[in-house]
C-alpha cells in the first residue's frame, strides 16, 4: 500500500501575550456547531454563530455536550470550569474506547512560529472510515477541530499568563484558510543488481 500522512494547518492572524512556553492542543469536535458570519473587527460586532456558551447561537437553548461517553463509546470532555463560567467552552472527543488519544499538542514560546501544524492522521483516518460505514465501532463524525490552551493557561486569571492567538477562518479573504495538508509517497523503491 501507499504511505500517506496528513497535517492540520491553521495560520496565525494575531498573537499577543505568548511570553513563556505554552502548549495548545487540537481535538476533534464532538458535536455540530454553527460557524457564524462575523469577521475580524466588525463594527458593530457580529455575534451570530457558536460561542463559549452554545454551539448554535445565543438564545438558541442548545448547550455544548456534557462530559461522558457517547453512543460509540468515545470519551467526550468539555472545557468549562464552573469557577469561571457555569457552562460552555466546547465539547470534543478525548479518546476512543480502545484508549486511543485524539488530542495533538503543539508548544509555543516567545520566538516560535505561531502557525499550527499538527499531525491529524489518527482522526482523519477515523473520519474517513466513518464516511464509508467501515468499522462502525470506531466511527467518529467529522465536526472539525477545536484548539484550546492547556488547562493551566486556559483557566489562569493572572494577567501575565493570558496569551491570545487568533487564526484565519475558513471564510478568510486571504490565502490562509485552515487546511488539511495530505502527503503521500506515490512510488516504490526497486532495487536492481545484486548486493554482495
How does the language model describe each region?
Residues 1-196:
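Secreted, disulfide-rich extracellular signaling modules
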Amino acid at each position: 500500500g501507499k504511505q500517506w500522512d496528513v497535517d492540520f494547518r491553521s495560520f496565525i492572524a494575531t498573537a499577543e501575550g505568548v511570553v513563556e512556553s505554552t502548549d495548545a492542543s487540537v481535538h476533534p469536535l464532538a458535536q455540530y456547531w454553527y460557524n457564524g458570519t462575523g469577521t475580524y473587527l466588525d463594527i458593530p460586532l457580529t455575534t451570530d454563530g457558536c460561542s463559549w456558551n452554545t454551539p448554535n447561537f445565543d438564545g438558541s437553548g442548545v448547550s455544548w455536550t456534557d462530559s461522558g461517553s457517547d453512543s460509540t463509546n468515545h470519551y467526550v470532555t468539555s472545557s468549562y470550569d464552573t469557577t469561571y463560567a457555569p457552562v460552555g467552552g466546547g465539547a470534543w472527543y478525548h479518546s476512543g474506547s480502545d484508549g486511543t488519544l485524539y488530542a495533538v499538542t503543539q508548544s509555543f514560546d516567545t520566538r516560535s512560529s505561531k502557525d499550527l501544524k499538527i499531525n491529524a492522521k489518527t482522526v482523519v483516518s477515523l473520519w474517513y472510515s466513518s464516511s464509508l460505514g467501515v468499522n462502525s465501532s470506531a466511527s467518529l463524525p467529522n465536526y472539525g477541530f477545536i484548539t484550546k490552551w492547556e488547562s493551566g493557561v486556559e483557566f489562569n486569571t493572572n494577567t501575565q499568563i493570558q496569551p491570545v492567538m487568533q487564526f484565519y477562518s475558513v471564510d478568510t479573504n486571504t490565502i490562509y484558510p485552515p487546511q488539511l495538508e495530505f502527503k503521500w509517497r506515490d512510488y516504490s523503491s526497486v532495487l536492481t543488481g545484486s548486493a554482495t
